[in-house]
Every structure is written in C-alpha cells, then in structure tokens.
A protein has these predicted regions:
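Short beta-strand-centered segments at strand-helix junctions
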Residues: 14-26
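Short regulatory alpha-helical segment in sensory/regulatory domains of signaling proteins that mediates
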Residues: 63-74
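A short, aliphatic-rich beta-strand micro-motif
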Residues: 138-145
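Regulatory sensory and allosteric helical modules in signal-transduction proteins
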Residues: 85, 92-130
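Juxtadomain coupling helices with adjacent low-complexity linkers
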Residues: 56-65, 96-99, 152-192
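Short hydrophobic alpha-helical segments used for membrane anchoring or interfacial signaling
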Residues: 73-86
C-alpha cells in the first residue's frame, strides 16, 4: 500500500475528511458508498463499494444473452470500470476504467445514442474505456438506476470499423430498447 503522508483527525461525530487529491485520484464523489474494513494490525481501510459487484455474474449472463440473440457487443459498467462484457474481449475490457465521456453520460442520467457524423464532417464517438489501444465505441447506452441513484450503465458497443456502419444507418431502435430493458432489469434486481 502506498503511503501518502497525510494525517487527519477524527471529529467528535466520528467523521474523517478524505483529502480532495485522494478523492479525485480514486474517483470518489460526494455521496459514493464506501466499505470500511479493519485488520489485525490496527489499520482502517476504506474501499469503494459498487452495488453492481453483487450482480457481476448475472450481468455477464444477461450481456451474453443479448449478444447471442441480437449480435451486437454489450458492456455493463459500474461508475468506475467495465464489470461484464459479451461479444468483445473480456481480457481486454473487464476491470478497465471507463472513459471520462462515459462517466459524464452516466452522470447525465439519460439515454445516449451515437450521433454518427456531426455538422463539421467529423465523427462524434464516445470511447468505452480510457485505453486508446482498445478502440470500442458506444452505439447506445442507458444508465442503471436503483432507488433513484445511478450505479452504472449498460451499453451496446462497436469497434471503430463497425461503428460508422451502425450509426450511419440510424436504425438503432432495437439496440436502444434492449439496452433500456437490460438497464431497468438490472436496476430492479438490485432493489429486490
């Protein structure tokens, strides 16, 4: 574990302030749930909690079913990384940090569909992950809501060459409905 050299005191209500630099680096937002662990050496460990982690196997099976039925690659993400995928290399994408653009889409709390080409003649693409070598782009994505909170998203994705063909047609109705259904279903599973 890397030592940061920052010391904080606990206030009379038992609160500890996590420095802004650490929150920014670890992508900890206001209101994010944290798990608290202790060990035998007297350490207190804070770990980001992802509600989707309870459904990783289930989300993977759902993504696999969508891929087999409809033929488009699917990724399920929490607020930080890709947690399940089908139709794309799991080794290449699982546990990879989502791109800043995907994070903003999740924050936006609404359906995203790729626009294809913009008015300047250039393509507007949203990469799935931060890794430029793994060129996979969102065709459509829907945030997953549970009890009013956004906890991630389900996305139909495509590699660079297939992205243009899929978005130029403008016929994304099927993908959109299936992705919306998947997001709603996974959200309901977490509420149950």
């Amino acid at each position: 574990m890397k030592a940061t050299g920052i010391v904080r005191r606990i206030d009379d209500l038992g609160r500890v302030v996590i420095p802004k630099e650490i929150r920014r680096t670890m992508r900890i937002r206001e209101g994010d749930p944290l798990e608290i662990y202790t060990d035998r050496e007297g350490e207190v460990i804070f770990k980001k909690y992802s509600p989707i982690s309870e459904l990783v196997d289930f989300a993977g099976q759902y993504a696999e079913s969508l891929y087999k039925t409809c033929g488009f690659p699917v990724a399920v993400c929490d607020r930080d990384s890709v947690v399940a995928a089908a139709g794309i290399s799991k080794k290449e994408f699982l546990d990879r940090k989502i791109s800043h653009e995907v994070d903003l889409l999740i924050e936006g709390r609404s359906l995203y569909t790729a626009a294809g080409w913009n008015e300047h003649g250039s393509e507007s693409r949203v990469p799935l992950t931060e890794d430029e070598r793994s060129a996979m782009y969102l065709v459509c994505a829907m945030p997953i809501f549970t009890e009013g909170d956004v906890i991630g998203c389900v996305a139909a994705v495509a590699p660079e060459d297939a992205f243009r063909a899929r978005t130029e047609k403008g016929e994304l109705e099927t993908e959109v409905k299936l992705i919306q259904t998947a997001a709603a279903f996974l959200g309901r599973q977490l509420e149950a």
